[in-house]
Amino acid sequence: YLNFMGLQCYHGSAQHYRLPKERQDAIAAVCAKAAEAKAAVEKAGVKVERITGAGTGSVMLEGSSSIFNEVQAGSYILMDRDYAKNQRDASDLAFEHALFIKTAILSHPSQGRAVVDAGLKASSVDSGMPLVWQRTDANYLKASDEHGVLELTPDSPLKLGDAIMLIPGHCDPTVNLYDEIICVRGDTVEAVWPIAARGALL
């Protein structure tokens, strides 16, 4: 049997509103609706012990409200390109990138193009193409199943065999593509985390 615990009040769209004011307004509306729903449920004689929600893009807003007593942020652990596009204000936490895809240049067909061995099977693109990490001379342009095409600046020094790091556009479905996460600190592999839920449907 099930025991009623509370209300799920997650606002998914607000996680990706770019401006702080947009997120603040959206979550203020969520808090008002959550309070109204709690009052209605408790008026009917059912205790609401928990109001849960929030995400990486708005966790400080729900967490500092007097309405939510549980938050569900998850992407902040790894971060991705899409969340990094959110503008922050002084109250927001500065989460760092911790998820990278290592790929290498397999082909250099022209001065302005290169092909890497990381495509759709390596990175989810539902929230945009990966970001080439810490490089201003390369832009990940498009992906096929096995490969990605880079657009290079005329002075790019990248050549065959060079390795680069990518930040996925969306961390959640990207992690689901792998069996393991290789955990590196500096030049040392400190752990290998199995992704036990990969492919799990239930």
What are these regions (language model features)?
Residues Y1, K43-G45, G63-S64, H97, ...:
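Solvent-exposed alpha-helices and their adjacent loops that cap or buttress functional pockets
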Residues Y1-R88:
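Active-site loop/helix belt of alpha/beta enzymes
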Residues A29-A32, E36, V46, E96-F100, ...:
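Conserved active-site and cofactor/substrate-binding residues in soluble primary-metabolism enzymes
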Residues P109-L202:
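C-terminal accessory subdomain/extension
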Residues N3, H11, L78-M79, K102, ...:
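Generic, ordered loop/turn and secondary-structure boundary motif
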Residues R23-A26, S58-T136:
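Active-site loop ensemble at the mouth of alpha/beta enzyme cores that anchors a bound cofactor
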